[in-house]
Amino acid sequence: MGLPIVAIVGRPNVGKSTLVNRLTGMMDAIVHDSPGVTRDRTYRPALWNGRDFSLVDTGGLVFDDQTEFLPFIRQQVMIALAEATVVVMVVDGQAGPTPADHEIAHWLRQQDTPVLLAVNKCESPEQGITQAAQFWELSLDEPLPVSGIHGNGTGDLLDQVVEYFSETPESEDEPEIKVALVGRPNVGKSSLLNAFVGENRSIVSPISGTTRDTIDMVVRRGEQTYRFIDTAGIRRKKNVSYGPEFFGINRAFKAIRRSQVVLFVIDALDGVTEQDQKLAGRIIDDGRACVLVVNKWDAVTKDTYTINEFSKQIRSRLNFMEWAEMIFVSAQTGQRVEKILNLVDTAARQFEQRVTTSVINEVLEEAVSWHTPPTTRQGRQGKIYYGTQVSSQPPTIALFVNNPDHFKDNYRRYIERQFRENLDFTGTPIRLLWRGKKLRDVERNTANRATRA
């Protein structure tokens, strides 16, 4: 069994995301002064009185409207309710009870899950008692005055929440691979996530920009656990207004940094765009392992040579990511989706790989014997004394040389290729740090190591 789940529900714009941010101590949920900002159900880790649990922020619940995303949001709320240990209904203490609140309360009373009532926006403790008293008419549990902004009353709310948990908390820390799903809007990231999870976890819609929160979902396959981060689509900044989508894009960049492996989703119909190239550069700058996922492959008219032609086109546009493995899939039909996790496993393993100094220097000696370092116009030849891995995630190797300026880009790329071919750094960037060092310092360090041995 997993952690207890607490579902946060309520009509639009009552401050659910603000309250979730307060209860979890995080600033992940997008908060913006317009209704309907949260669309998917979003999971946040929380801790109170030594009990770990998950808070689920859901979209604003409206029953009598079929426009845009509202039917999808209702479906998400119902799924959250089905898996929750306890539900917290959030209402607006400043607005007072509304017909929508009554409708939601009536629906919740018909469910089997226990319900707590949080009266939000009670910024003054004195006025909060009066504001909360109005909500007895909803015929739920005692109305609890809280303030998502200032934190008033949140401790009392959490005290009641944890009372619904079982007496045997699970505190096992499972190793997991953190995977970020990134790409331009409407390339099929949420459809891929749903294919992995096996349910409509994220709102899937042909309207560009549907997902605006980063959404975490844990998936288990065999003994391996994966934490998928479904991010907002990334588009050119000049095409993004200052609002929820702006914040979602910035959080997508944070999701890349938070991940170990990035599933970079590309639309097979559009190919690699200029924005895709910039996003690829972002992944490399952040030093993350990567798998290129070419989605919507079912929509492409194919013959015997199609996949090779597409591969060449994509590789030529992303020639600086030649180390990333590529797979052609269809989230719609499920074609090859399961194989993505095999590539994730490989990329994550190589991302964390550590190689002994002796093996690194064997590769260097072989590389130099086949292709000696260049000589400058002044007759000075570059010399590589030795190399050693200084960190992983991504693998980073320091090369100690007589003068880094003697080694131009073409020779540096050659050395990187030798490491990749001999040490199998598939799916991960590697960083080479070229460090100047005088020969006598190298000899002294070598002698010191020999003496200690």
UniProtKB/Swiss-Prot annotation:
Positions with a binding annotation for GTP 1: 10-17, 57-61, 120-123
Residue ranges that the Swiss-Prot or TrEMBL entry lists as coiled coil: none
Domain EngA-type G: 4-169, 177-352
Keywords: GTP-binding, Nucleotide-binding, Repeat, Ribosome biogenesis
An example Gene Ontology biological process: ribosome biogenesis
Domain KH-like, residue spans: 353-438
Single GO molecular function: ribosome binding
Record has Thylakoid as a keyword: no
Domain of life: Bacteria
UniProt record similarity statement: Belongs to the TRAFAC class TrmE-Era-EngA-EngB-Septin-like GTPase superfamily. EngA (Der) GTPase family.
Record note on quaternary structure: Associates with the 50S ribosomal subunit.
Xref: NCBIfam families: GTPase_EngA (TIGR03594), small_GTP (TIGR00231)
General function of this protein: GTPase that plays an essential role in the late steps of ribosome biogenesis.
Protein name as it appears in the record: GTPase Der
Organism encoding this protein: Acaryochloris marina (strain MBIC 11017)
